[in-house]
């Protein structure tokens, strides 16, 4: 199942590699999604390296390896888009300013599904079966947050490569959520509640870059 999922994820990310967006073709939503999702992916990669190193379970290690490869590749692609668009990699308005229903101004750690530094440190210091369960319990809400961000980008983004990547992220990460929930169940554990995230505020401006 993991191999099939990896193929699906690779296919989902291929539209972004097939064509490079041209300078000046990005809206605030295109840029904001690429910027924030790159940060979101960075934490998923970090936690997956910790899980890979802290457990000998092949199923969890294979999942972690797939997350590392897929999300590191997508992160590099999104940072490359920002370079092409001559857009900053850090927003002066804070994270999530592009997403309707959020006013921005928040720290990257406040993005949907992001683990706290304390949770990441706990994963770093946890080994074996406990590390497997903790990794899955952190990654499920992390993926749920990523899906919410990608669904917003599907609606708000205007660049076709950005929309294609966002659509692929929704499909792939939802599949991984289902897989990780099943993996937790086989380990006698359940997902932890997803963070509700910050309260909505005024819609983000729709000005173009």
Where are these regions (language model features)?
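All-alpha RGS (Regulator of G-protein Signaling) helical domain and cognate RGS-like helical scaffolds
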Residues: 2-209
